[in-house]
Amino acid sequence: MTVNFDLTVIWAFIIAFAVFAYVVMDGFDLGIGILFPTFEVGPERDRAMNSIAPVWDGNETWLVLGGGGLFAAFPLAYAVVLPATYPLIIAMLLGLVFRGVAFEYRWRDPDHRRLWDAAFTGGSLVAAMAQGMTLGALLQGIEVVDRAYAGSWFDWLTPYTLLTGLGTVAGYALLGATWLVWKLDGPSQHHARQLAKRAAWATLVLMGGVSLYNLGLRPEYAVRWLTAPEIYFVAPVPVLTGVVAIMLLRSLSVERHSKPFWLSLALFFFGMAGLGVTMWPFVVPPGLTIWDAAAPERSQMFMLVGVAITMPLIIAYTAWAYWVFRGKVADEGYH
């Protein structure tokens, strides 16, 4: 019996996995930056930075894989999405640069630590907001004519994209706070737990707002979620999201350490699954499906061989790094 694999679908899931890995791994780094002004100047800020110092730069590997995979496997989508979101992409990259430089120089230039702390927060906030707005710009639809972007410079700036941007900021803050609940102890952990409770409610409210907005955003989105028989297949996503949300709020009300972080990851997983269900099979709504934007099959197969070799290595290295630096963070840090 011959089994046929759709390489385009395989590549769609590879890129979705890379994006999810980036969001949840670099998300808590950015979340700590977003929350940084709420931490006490001195040891509390240092411990927060030390908790991510060994892993933050490696987490961005997934962003490179996701972006590079989009360029290689779906070149038409890459050629449309970038011109439509150039200001957001530029803002995101500049934010990541400021975040990275500030991370290193706050230790090497203690005389200007307040300046670097502000750059760390500003870069993290800008990067998170830009990523969320880019997602919103994609979901609301991009105008394509003759296989090229046909919109204006500011089509990405709408109330909906601002909502998705704020939702991403709140979600990253939740990841950052629950990461610190896991990695810190004492008064710093208690402070992180209080921040996580607020961030959890903000995330859930904004997720609900985005979900309701999606139903009126495009007719096909409402059909996907509200009509039979589609609703029977997609209903488990919001149901499981609700279950995870309740478990998360309960875990933050008791003295749990790692559980809130894992539940936050699960919340992100189901949130992104819901967005995937909403968009499928479009890679650039409303006109380009994954098959419309895909590279030739021989190119996809060639790249799949490379990914089959490199992705397990990346996963293994990432797992090893997190294992080596497991446990609570003390005052003596990576730097």
PLM-predicted stretches and their roles:
Residues 99-106, 278-290:
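Transmembrane alpha-helical segments of integral membrane proteins
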Residues 55-126, 145, 224-232:
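Membrane-interface helix-loop-helix modules in multi-pass inner-membrane proteins
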Residues 30-54, 71-81, 104-114, 176-195, ...:
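Juxtamembrane membrane-water interface segments of multi-pass membrane proteins
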Residues 11-22, 82-94, 121-126, 155-169, ...:
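Alpha-helical transmembrane segments
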Residues 1-13, 71-85, 139-159, 216:
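Helix-coil boundary and interhelical linker segments in multi-pass alpha-helical membrane proteins
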